[in-house]
Amino acid sequence: MNLCSSGATASTTSLSSTGQAERSGGVPGGGAEGGGGGGGSGNSGGGGKTSDVSAEASTLCFAGGSGTAGAITGTEELSNANSPANGAGGASGSTGSGQQPTGSNGHSHLHNENNANMPPETRPKMVTVKHPESNKPKPTTKKSKPIQADQDVIKALQRCRIKRLDLSKSSITVIPSTVKECVHLTELYLYSNKIGQLPPEIGCLVSLRNLALNENSLTSLPESLQNCSQLKVLDLRHNKLAEIPPVIYRLRSLTTLYLRFNRITAVADDLRQLVNLTMLSLRENKIRELGSAIGALVNLTTLDVSHNHLEHLPEDIGNCVNLSALDLQHNELLDIPDSIGNLKSLVRLGMRYNRLSSVPATLKNCKSMDEFNVEGNGITQLPDGMLASLSGLTTITLSRNQFASYPTGGPAQFTNVYSINLEHNRIDKIPYGIFSRAKGLTKLNMKENMLTALPLDIGTWVNMVELNLATNALQKLPDDIMNLQNLEILILSNNMLKKIPNTIGNLRRLRILDLEENRIEVLPHEIGLLHELQRLILQTNQITMLPRSIGHLGNLTHLSVSENNLQFLPEEIGSLESLENLYINQNPGLEKLPFELALCQNLKYLNIDKCPLSTIPPEIQAGGPSLVLQWLKMHSPYRQIDCYYQYELQTVNQAPGAGGNGGGGAAAAGGSASRSSDRR
């Protein structure tokens, strides 16, 4: 029995790109020509011109669960049918006379009066499309909806004479055998459904070039799929495949194969048959071994085998000489083969989070690489001069390894680099002059190392924008830090600093200054010169007072001074108009808050836990920060003065002969002053 025998007649109805139901011979009266769509121009309505839109431009999309015969998406919008000013007016299905289609329940029915006298078997089929502006609620997901969706799929396939069919996100559970009628299809999109298996009739789509089956529940593929010999792109991401279906190896025309996020444990040697593959994604599976067959895929440009359980790579990987992107991150790799040096077209090599203790010296041959990332391994040193050989590198990430010193190779290895990350290693010093050629270096992360001092030439890092030196053993900052005038982020938390140099005030572009968990007792007055500062973190130090110049930090939104020895807050804190978050908790000597704090109108969060605020009643403190701020406002002398002047003005305006007798006004003011004095 031939699965692909067709029972369709020549008069089968299809949906043209204008969104109009038309027979293969064309429907007179109406139909936009040339551009179609909601706002497209063209010849519209009347005149009896036949629409002749090519099948290549046609697209049928199905909106699942709507209960309609089908919905049209893309550039065509039938909701614009009521606008006679554009070409879509004809495309909406209105008659040549311009009669507006009508419907009920927010739906517009395609209708043509000229069809009334036609025999029933030759009339164009009706398509119902929901208006976007309809207030009718969309149906909720119910058990019965997929059944309705499957029925609508059958109807859609019966009309199928197009080249691109989109049935994605439609709650489809079954693809009917009538799919064999769609022999003209070149693109079929079935992603985000509930399909458990494909019918054998899928093999009848011999013109298919793009098949998207991602986000379903497929566990296998039918053998008949091998008949789709022109298939170029196959997407099977997010399914339930326990192996690569054998039929895939017979699809010799494949150029792109997505198998991400399945349950695949092995790759068969038959993979070598897919010699036309340029992109292969096996990401997020359970693969433990990648066989030598990978070396036969000489046209590969992208290979993603990340997030698997690979321990080794075959030497044959070096045969994939056209690879530009190789992602090996989040595996269990113990080594990288020397043949990796053959991949001279390699631009991106991801080796993050494996079990590597070294990398091969042959990597220096991959001179096209612009990023080198081995984060999260156990590497102690790089081959001599390797980074210097990779002169195109702009980003180097060596974080979370076992480096005890900077890589050998001198200043030349950082010539074109703008970002260096050596976080979480065991480096105890930054070599003098190591960045002397790194004129473009803007970001340096040395967090969680063993630094006790900074190099004397730190003042030459003039282009530095972000400097992270947190969690080291630094005891002082050199005065030359003043030369880093492009610095915007300075992280010095968890060190052993006792003071901050006055020259800190020269860092006029600084936005974030983090000094948490040091031994600082006093902040320099020059801190007030950092007018761009937005976050100042002083938590867990030994600070007894804040400088009054802090009131000049008009852009400050976050201030943390918790866990210190504050005795008071300066009145100037009321000048911080942008302040949103203030942490002053756990200051055992802080007994009162300045009334000026109530002037911080943008303050959203105030933490005063474990502060002995003796001047504020306990019941107010128990009510939380918002009640404390309200109490400060109510008892602020500024509020009393304001009330005094408001009362005085009101009294003057209400006095007999106000404005004409200065003495009367003075008396009233005096009375109000007396009452204000009594209140005080």
From Swiss-Prot:
Record-linked SMART domains: LRR_BAC (SM00364), LRR_SD22 (SM00365), LRR_TYP (SM00369)
Q: Which UniProt keywords apply?
A: Leucine-rich repeat, Repeat
Question: Which region is the signal sequence?
Answer: none
For the region Disordered, give the residue spans: 1-54, 73-149, 658-680
Regions crossing the membrane: none
**Compositionally biased residues, Gly residues:** 26-49, 87-96, 658-668
Pfam families associated with the record? LRR_1, LRR_14, LRR_8
Task: Describe where the LRR repeats fall, as residue ranges on this chain.
Answer: 161-182, 184-205, 207-228, 230-251, 253-274, 276-297, 299-320, 322-343, 345-367, 368-389, 392-413, 416-437, 440-461, 463-484, 486-507, 509-530, 532-553, 555-576, 578-600, 602-623
Give start-end positions of Low complexity composition bias. 1-19, 73-86, 97-106, 669-680
Family, according to the entry, reads as follows: Belongs to the SHOC2 family.
Function per UniProt: Acts as a Ras effector and participates in MAPK pathway activation. Probably acts as a regulatory subunit of protein phosphatase that specifically dephosphorylates Raf kinase and stimulate Raf activity at specialized signaling complexes upon Ras activation.
UniProt-recorded name of the protein: Leucine-rich repeat protein soc-2 homolog
| Gene it is expressed from | Sur-8
